[in-house]
């Protein structure tokens, strides 16, 4: 409720201003008690010719006559000589007119003066009270040209390189920046110049902001943090003014670090878009370029910025002398994920059954923010279940929640639909388990999760991969189509549950043909040109650069890949129909089936054939290692 108090004060102040204006206008223009002016000759004529019209005459010692008629009319006449005109006073008295005397200044005058002074004083008090309230809220009403940067002083919530993991190369790159901030003379002695700007590039959540804070923490210098969107406002020129103010603050607190997060909000390529771009944003960018040229790196100011869209930044921003060093933060590998998990878990009570190495292997593709969220989700689950330590099952459930969404056990599914979902998921699992290049199955579940998923089959790669072979892609497409193949094999009809699988399989097959050159018929050619459309604000689009005949051949090749993979999936499930039925019954009973249990059952059922498959998978893994 405290946040609404300034709004109430503003409303009260506005109401008082309106009432005061109404009162003043009414007093000056509509006051019926205000006297009218009358000449002395008109008064003498009325006194002698129409004395019956006059009700009262008040003679003031300052020479003012106040004449009131019987009709309620009120007149004022300035006639200081009237006090000596005894004849007229006698005539009025004889005609029954009341004639009285009064002091020069009436008490009503002082009442009005005092009332106005009190009212104006109250308005001034309210005005200064509002100004004080606004000043307490960072004086936002009058300092919109000031920089919005948040300044962290040395020692305040200090972050160091010990709090950063999974980006060892980036840390090594930035250690020399720390040395420069601690001892600039060490570099100037040998004529070395530190980069004026350092651009941190990487996907969202990889720790760009954290790494910038760690550099400031290691160097123990002030840290200015501002978002690129904080520069541009409604008013023209505000962005450029804020840039100037930011660098003035930095110069006053040197040595320091200025960190601009999401710099693409203000540093986008100039002139992009219809109409030539955004003038205010470009003016802000121009001022930023000028400021980066204007300061001497020997002052100890290092400008750092972060973006996940380096392709749309203006070239002038990236030239030497501005952001002349790029530091790339990539998705962490299994070792990096393990170190990140250890950092986030070090202040939490972890049970003895938790294996951080296994969790790192099962979180392929997770970035630092995902892993922090994973640990926090596991802690929440442990607290919800009344445990004082976080167990491995909490982490497993947290992984499922992050990947597929929270379980929705309250959703009512008919027995027939539940059986269809079970066959669909087991179809995925069996096909993927029997393909030598598919990712191992980690878990099968028919518990609804997230928005629309009625079940899921979670496959996690055994290790990080940076290259994918053609056969691995084909096995992946075949595994995606295993669910639909099981539905058609068992129920002789298909459902809408495979829509997402078909979409992913088709897209993967099209990329194999058009992007990876993996079509035997069309050969190692790239079809479709990736361009940056200037009229789309430098957005990536894929332009068609081939004929209608080639387009037809591409569609035919995509159809061939998907159809052959689908037939292959049906062939596998037809051959292992018995195992499919047994696993479905087990899954319907338990609702969740772990990957290890699945492989154990298949090895028991298939014997030597499953052993040979394990050898094929191991051989594929050793080829990747080489």
Curated annotation (Swiss-Prot):
Residues 29-108 are periplasmic. Zn(2+) binds at residues 424, 428, 501. ATP binds at residues 202-209. GO terms for biological process: protein catabolic process; proteolysis. Binds 1 zinc ion per subunit. The chain crosses the membrane at residues 8-28, 109-129. This is ATP-dependent zinc metalloprotease FtsH.
């Amino acid at each position: 409720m405290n946040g609404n108090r300034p709004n109430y004060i503003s409303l009260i102040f506005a109401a008082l201003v309106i009432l005061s204006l109404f009162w003043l206008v009414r007093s000056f223009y509509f006051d019926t008690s205000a006297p009218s002016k009358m000449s002395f000759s008109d008064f003498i004529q009325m006194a002698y010719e129409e004395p019956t019209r006059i009700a009262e005459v008040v003679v003031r010692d300052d020479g003012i006559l106040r004449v009131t008629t019987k009709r309620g009319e009120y007149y004022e006449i300035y006639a200081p000589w009237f006090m000596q005109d005894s004849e007229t006073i006698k005539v009025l008295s004889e005609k029954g007119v009341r004639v009285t005397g009064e002091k020069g200044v009436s008490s009503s005058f002082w009442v009005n003066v005092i009332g106005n002074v009190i009212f104006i004083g109250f308005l001034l008090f309210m005005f200064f009270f509002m100004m004080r309230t606004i000043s307490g809220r960072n004086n936002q009403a009058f300092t919109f040209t000031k920089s919005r940067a948040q300044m962290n002083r040395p020692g305040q919530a200090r972050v160091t390189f010990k709090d950063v993991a999974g980006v060892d190369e980036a840390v090594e790159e930035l250690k020399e920046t720390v040395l420069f901030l601690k001892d600039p003379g060490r570099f100037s002695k040998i004529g070395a110049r530190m980069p004026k700007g350092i651009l941190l590039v990487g996907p969202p959540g990889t720790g760009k902001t954290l790494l910038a804070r760690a550099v400031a923490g290691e160097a123990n210098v002030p840290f200015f943090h501002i978002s690129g969107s904080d520069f541009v406002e409604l008013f023209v020129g505000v962005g450029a003014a804020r840039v100037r103010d930011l660098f003035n603050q930095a110069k006053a607190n040197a040595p320091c670090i200025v960190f601009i997060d999401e710099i693409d909000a203000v540093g986008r390529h100039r002139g992009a878009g219809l109409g030539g771009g955004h003038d205010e944003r470009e003016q802000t960018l121009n001022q930023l370029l000028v400021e980066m040229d204007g300061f001497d790196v020997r002052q100890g100011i290092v400008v750092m910025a972060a973006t996940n869209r380096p392709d749309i930044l203006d070239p002038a921003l990236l030239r030497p002398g501005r952001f002349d060093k790029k530091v790339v933060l990539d998705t962490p590998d299994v070792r990096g994920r393990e170190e990140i998990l250890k950092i986030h878990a070090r202040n939490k009570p972890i049970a003895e059954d938790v294996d951080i190495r296994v969790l790192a292997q099962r979180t392929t593709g997770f970035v630092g923010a995902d892993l922090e969220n994973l640990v926090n989700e596991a802690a929440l689950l442990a607290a919800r279940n009344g445990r004082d330590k976080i167990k491995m099952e909490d982490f497993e459930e947290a992984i499922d929640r992050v990947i597929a969404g929270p379980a929705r056990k309250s959703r009512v599914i008919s027995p027939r639909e539940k059986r269809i979902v079970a066959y669909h998921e087991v179809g995925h699992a069996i096909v993927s388990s029997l393909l030598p290049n598919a990712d191992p199955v980690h878990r099968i579940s028919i518990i609804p999760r997230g928005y629309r998923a009625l079940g899921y089959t979670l496959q996690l790669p055994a290790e990080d991969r940076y290259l994918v072979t053609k056969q691995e892609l084909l096995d992946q497409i075949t595994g995606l189509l295993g669910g639909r193949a099981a539905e058609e094999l068992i129920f002789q009809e298909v459902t809408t549950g495979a829509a997402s699988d078909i979409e992913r399989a088709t897209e993967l097959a099209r990329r194999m043909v058009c992007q990876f050159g993996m079509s035997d018929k069309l050969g190692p050619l790239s079809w479709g040109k990736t361009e940056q459309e200037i009229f789309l604000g430098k957005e990536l689009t894929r332009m068609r650069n081939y004929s209608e005949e080639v387009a037809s051949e591409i569609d035919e090749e995509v159809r061939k890949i998907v159809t052959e993979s689908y037939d292959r999936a049906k062939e596998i499930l037809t051959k292992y129909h018995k195992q499919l039925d047994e696993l479905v019954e087990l899954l319907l009973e338990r609702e969740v089936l772990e990957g290890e249990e699945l492989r154990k059952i298949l090895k028991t059922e298939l014997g030597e054939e499953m052993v040979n498959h394990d050898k094929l998978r191991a051989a594929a893994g050793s080829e990747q290692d080489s």
